[in-house]
Each structure stands twice: as C-alpha cells, then as structure tokens.
Amino acid sequence: MSWSLQPPSFLLCCLLLLFSPTGLAYVATRDNCCILDERFGSFCPTTCGIADFLSSYQTDVDNDLRTLEDILFRAENRTTEAKELIKAIQVYYNPDQPPKPGMIDSATQKSKKMVEEIVKYEALLLTHETSIRYLQEIYNSNNQKITNLKQKVAQLEAQCQEPCKDSVQIHDTTGKDCQEIANKGAKESGLYFIRPLKAKQQFLVYCEIDGSGNGWTVLQKRIDGSLDFKKNWIQYKEGFGHLSPTGTTEFWLGNEKIHLISMQSTIPYALRIQLKDWNGRTSTADYAMFRVGPESDKYRLTYAYFIGGDAGDAFDGYDFGDDPSDKFFTSHNGMQFSTWDNDNDKFEGNCAEQDGSGWWMNKCHAGHLNGVYHQGGTYSKSSTTNGFDDGIIWATWKSRWYSMKETTMKIIPFNRLSIGEGQQHHMGGSKQAGDV
C-alpha cells in the first residue's frame, strides 16, 4: 500500500493522532477519526485500530507522566539544598588556612571528658535510684508499722475504757505458812497470802500443794536463767523476781521472809532442795530443822542434820582435792549470808562478789544455788568472769564445773515429811550452829 493513495482526510486524521497531546487536547474516537472505506478497512490498521489502541493506553501514560514530573520536582529540591550546603561550607572553610596544632586532639579530649562525665552521672543516677527505692521500702514499712501501732493503741484505749481486772489468780485462803493453808482445805498449787506469827503484815508466796495434803512453801526457784541473781544486800533481804500462779518464774523470796517463816513454830521445818540437770535427771537433798536467823545475825543458816536424798549432802562440804581443808571450808551449816556489798564469809576475799551472787558462803562453797546460770550445764574457768566455779553447783551430785538447769528450795513442817518417799533419817550426829 502506498501513502500517496490515501485521501487527504485520512492523512490529516493520522497527523492529529500523532502530534496532538494525549491528555485533554484531543481524544480519538470512531466518530471523529475512523473512515469506513472498504478498500482499506481490512488491510490498513492505521485508521480505527490505531484509535482504539491509543485510547486503551492513554490513562496509564498520563499516570506515568505525572510520576516522572514528581520525581523531577524532588530532584530539583535536593539539588537546591545541596547547592546551599556547598555555599555554607565554602563560607566557613578556607582551604588556604591550615588547621591549628592540637585542635583535633583538644576536641578528642573534650569528647572523652564529656563521655566520662556522662558515664559518671549515669552511675550516680543509678545509685540514687537504688537509694530512692530503698528509702521507699523503708517508708512503706514504717507506714505499715505506724498503722499497726495505731491499731494497737486503739485496742489499748478500748481496753482502758473497761474496769481493771487482776488477771493473776490469788487464792483467798490464808495462813501462817502453806501447810496451814493446805490444812484448811486448799488443794491447788498457786499464789497465796501468808502471815507468819511475828510478821507485821501478810505477803505473797507460791504454795506447792500435793495430793497428800502437803503444803510446801517455796523459797527459791531457778528455771531458765531469765533472772540475774547478782543482787545487793537489800534486794536479797526483801526478795526479787516474780511469783507466778503456775510456779514457772524465777525468784528469791527474801531473807527476812525466810527468817520469819522458819523461826515461827515450835515444830521445826525441813528444807528440801530439788535439782534438775540438762539431761532431765532430777535429785533431792533434805535437811532437818532448817532455820535462818535475823538480820542482826546476818541471816545465819542452821540445820540439825542431813535427812537424805540422792543429791548428797553438799551443805556438809566437799573435798575437791585442792587442799586437805577443802571439806571444812566449803561447808555451809552455821554460815552467815553474804552479798557483794555485805561480806560475811570466812574468805580473805569476797566470795559473793567473785561468784556474782548472794549465799551462805564459807570459803567459799560446795553447794551454791544462787550462782551464775550457765547454759548447757558444763562450763570452765575460762568461761567465767573471775576464773572461779561460780555456777549453780551441788558438788556431791555433779562436778563444780557443772551448772544445774533447774533448782527449787522449799520448806515444810518436819512432821509432814512422807515416810513413804524413801527418805533416810539420820538422827545421830546432828550439826549445830558453830560446829564448823
């Protein structure tokens, strides 16, 4: 086919299609471009076929053009920014002027110092954060404690609104000693008031009453070492410690009270000493006609004889093997009472002061129930304050370096001792005051 054979109108249409804008200027359609000439209809695709082809791709071409225009716009902006940056560098940079000596090193050192300061402040910050958390925990704990205390105060205030009641049970029955109280029908051990014949007023004691009707008046008790027995003369005279309804506290009844009880009757008293070691084994020692003299005689201890008991007669002294006179100078019958501030012993020193107690000291002792409470029983010179056997000792039962766990001293009228307990009565050879 030759282009010279096409009609002018067809050529004009093709030129319009080729050179006209693809956007809004001209849109090719069958009506304005297609020439229905059978001579070319099936052989010349440059008429209606070209119009259909361009029409189908027109939208995509327009989108691509807009994308290219946007890319060109951004590139122009970046170019402008780069030019401005180059101008700024040219203003501050002088290629003809060399850098100052040490400028780079100085900047490096400043950078290092800044890093070190940052690290230091970060560590300090962490430390402060830890302290703040710790203080916050203390604050919260204290707040809880304050809340608990406020609750307890409120409870106490509520209790104080109620009438006061004595929670310690003191029995109503009274007598001159615990045996008289038992004779009046009392069957329960506990706290009772007694008034010995020469006493100006009644005082509280712990009575141990058994099923046979025996009423023991308790003079001393050691249980757990909770009470310090290093007291002065007045304290031993008046008594110290606490009396409990259950008999489970430590105390010394008082020398004046012991004197008033033991000297009041024509029927003499028997003294029983009860001991318990740290393995739970127990033993006793009984003494007949036990008495304690008045303060004017320094509360002198006397007894007639050792009745018996598997603990042995430590009050009669003990031969420790240190000196032939050990037994004589460690006996207790007829000895006056001594404390650290009132020395009445036979020793050139002060037995009560060196042993930290008050007792009927000789020079010094074989039986000592008011001594220092040594936990576990066994002790040594190195574990004591002055290097002496200052424990709760009973040398005829345990070594003088073995301290008892529990002790009790109690008295009862001599005629109330039970024959069935297996006590051995040694009526002969009784010791009187001053025999030692």
Curated annotation (Swiss-Prot):
Highest taxon above the source species: Eukaryota
Compartment(s) where it occurs, according to its Swiss-Prot or TrEMBL record: Secreted
GO biological process: adaptive immune response; innate immune response; platelet activation; protein polymerization
Post-translational modification: Conversion of fibrinogen to fibrin is triggered by thrombin, which cleaves fibrinopeptides A and B from alpha and beta chains, and thus exposes the N-terminal polymerization sites responsible for the formation of the soft clot. The soft clot is converted into the hard clot by factor XIIIA which catalyzes the epsilon-(gamma-glutamyl)lysine cross-linking between gamma chains (stronger) and between alpha chains (weaker) of different monomers.
Signal peptide positions (record): 1-25
Entry keyword annotation includes Coiled coil: yes
Phosphoserine, modified sites: S430
PROSITE patterns reported for this sequence: FIBRINOGEN_C_1, FIBRINOGEN_C_2
Cross-link (Isoglutamyl lysine isopeptide (Gln-Lys) (interchain with K-431)): Q423
Keyword Nucleotide-binding: no
One cellular-component annotation, GO: synapse
Disulfide linkage: C178-C207, C351-C364
Matches recorded under Pfam families: Fib_alpha, Fibrinogen_C
Residue stretches making up the Fibrinogen C-terminal domain: 169-415
Subunit structure: Heterohexamer; disulfide linked. Contains 2 sets of 3 non-identical chains (alpha, beta and gamma). The 2 heterotrimers are in head to head conformation with the N-termini in a small central domain.
Domain notes: A long coiled coil structure formed by 3 polypeptide chains connects the central nodule to the C-terminal domains (distal nodules). The long C-terminal ends of the alpha chains fold back, contributing a fourth strand to the coiled coil structure.
Listed name of the protein: Fibrinogen gamma chain
Organism: Mus musculus
Gene coding for it: Fgg
